[in-house]
Amino acid sequence: MNARTEPSEAEPGATARPPLVRELLLVVGLFLVYKFGRQLVAGHTPEAFRNAGRVWDWERALHLPSERSVQSLLLHGDTLAHVANTYYATVHFPATVAFLVWLYFKRPAHYVWARRVLASLTGAALVLHLAFPLAPPRMLAAAGLVDTAKVYGPSVYGPPQTDTLSNQFAAMPSLHFGWALMVAIGLIAATRSRWRPLWLLHPLVTLTVIVGTANHYWLDAIVAAALLGIALAVLHAPRRTASTAGPAREKLAPATSEKKNVLVGAGR
């Protein structure tokens, strides 16, 4: 027979998709530990404001630009401020979930890597929240910033004294920025499109929003980026192969001449 059957070989970089139920329980469990763990410093108001003053002074000592320069861009009209508040309130968590879901079904190897990196980043953030409670700049009188969510809406926070669903003194580091940066890095690593660097617009817009709405200091984002860098240095991304970074369009070489040579040789 001329037809040959060759066993298919598994791609060296291929990774089996983890069981879905286990992953759901793991991710939800880790998030709940973080969510409830950071509530432990919710009542540390005096310390949070002292740390806010320190961070503000550190930024001036480092000659970082004032957060007012970014906020002034959003205060040219009610619409822009409202859009920024909406982005802050609605994009952060759904974008990260969508990122993990897509990786789980399309790039299992990158999913495992991204989940580990995000878990490490979030765990390190929780430690910092507990060790360094920090009031956001919108609460710091010395900053002279507008609480855009309170003035223009929508707001995801209530008064700190009565808000039991969130810890508003967990500003350092900014997981809004840390997660957004990981989403961009993960999608760049997991895809092949020449347009994939555009994913960096997500953390760039997020940085503008969190600073412009006075929810975070520059240092909150800098520390988040540093923690993410450490996690990425320890947890390496999967090697890029056809199975880990998506199928690439391949050119098939014509086999007509080869078949002719085989047939001619067989008749001699």
Regions found by a protein language model. Give the residues of each.
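Hydrophobic, membrane-inserted alpha-helices
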Residues: 95-100, 178-185, 202-209
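Interfacial helix-loop-helix junctions of multi-pass membrane proteins
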Residues: 134-143, 167-171, 205-231
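C-terminal membrane module of polytopic membrane proteins
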Residues: 213-214, 219-268
